[in-house]
């Protein structure tokens, strides 16, 4: 740029201008400061599997090398970038946060004039979010009747107080999470190579609700429905009444609903 400089000398009459001249100043090259999605300010929230834009905010005709660092993973996004570049954070990065829904990372930019690096490497932070629908996947729920009587009549119904079902359902977590618990109507099911099983009885309805929770705390639910039949087990009341206090004989009365 240009600057006007004045030179003064002192006399008994005060400071008097002596000479005025113009200097041409050399422009100092500065490294570019990156930002995400907006510029010059940074908008750090991005989603795995969704493209974002990384702005260079350059001050001269420079090119740039853009890199990322997330957890123990790092890599080059692009080289020779002039103004901006697009980056889709791979979902494979999510194996760095198996127990969290977000994680922090860094975008780094090296600035070049030709092959000469300008200044220090500049960076900006980002917060990586899970994609939508990252909850556990619940497969087909299988209900197998264990009571011989119900099974003989119709194994695909639930009979109050009698039915006992073996519940079996495949469940899997997404994006490097692990399954923490799987329940059916509040009863914890056991894991057998990704298929969760358990026995459910004493039902008051025909709905079998599966709830799966992963290591990130994300939940999903699904349910199987069966026709439900109310049923009360038969019972009787019996009373024996002597004919007299000394009699060896009496009357037995038996009653019960059916």
Show the residue positions of the predicted features.
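Short beta-strand segments within Ig-like beta-sandwich modules, predominantly Fibronectin type-III
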Residues: 76-85, 186-194
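Short, compositionally biased P/S/T/A/G/V-rich stretches that sit at domain boundaries
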Residues: 26-51, 131-160, 228-249
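Surface-exposed, short loops/turns at beta-strand junctions within beta-sandwich domains
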Residues: 1, 91-105, 118, 197-206
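Edge beta-strands of extracellular beta-sandwich domains
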Residues: 17-24, 116-129, 218-228
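Exposed low-complexity, polar/acidic, P/S/T/G-rich flexible segments that act as propeptides
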Residues: 8-33, 133
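Conserved structural position at the C-terminal beta-strand
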Residues: 109-111, 212-214
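Aromatic/hydrophobic beta-strand junction motif of beta-rich domains
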Residues: 48-60, 161, 165-175, 250-258
């Amino acid at each position: 740029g240009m600057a006007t400089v004045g030179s003064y000398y002192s006399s008994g009459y005060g400071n008097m201008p002596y000479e005025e001249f113009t200097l041409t100043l050399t422009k100092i090259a500065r490294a570019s400061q990156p930002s995400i999605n907006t510029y010059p300010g940074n908008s750090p929230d991005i989603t795995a599997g969704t493209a974002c834009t990384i702005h260079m905010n350059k001050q001269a005709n420079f090119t740039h090398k853009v890199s990322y660092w997330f957890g123990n993973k790092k890599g080059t996004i692009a080289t020779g970038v002039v103004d901006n570049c697009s980056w889709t954070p791979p979902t494979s990065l999510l194996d760095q946060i198996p127990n969290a829904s977000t994680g922090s990372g860094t975008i780094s930019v090296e600035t070049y004039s030709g092959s000469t690096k300008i200044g220090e490497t500049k960076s900006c932070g980002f917060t990586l979010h899970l994609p939508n629908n990252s909850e556990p996947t619940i497969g087909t729920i299988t209900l197998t009747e264990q009571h011989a009587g119900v099974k003989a009549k119709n194994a695909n119904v639930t009979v109050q107080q009698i039915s006992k079902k073996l519940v079996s359902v495949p469940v899997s977590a997404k994006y490097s999470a692990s399954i923490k618990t799987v329940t059916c109507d509040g009863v914890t099911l056991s894991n057998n190579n990704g298929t969760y099983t358990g026995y459910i009885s004493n039902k008051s309805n025909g709905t079998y609700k599966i709830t799966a929770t992963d290591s990130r705390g994300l939940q999903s639910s699904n349910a199987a429905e069966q026709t439900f039949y109310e049923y009360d087990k038969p019972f009787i009341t019996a009373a024996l009444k002597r004919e007299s206090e000394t009699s060896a004989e009496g009357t037995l009365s038996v009653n019960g609903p059916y």
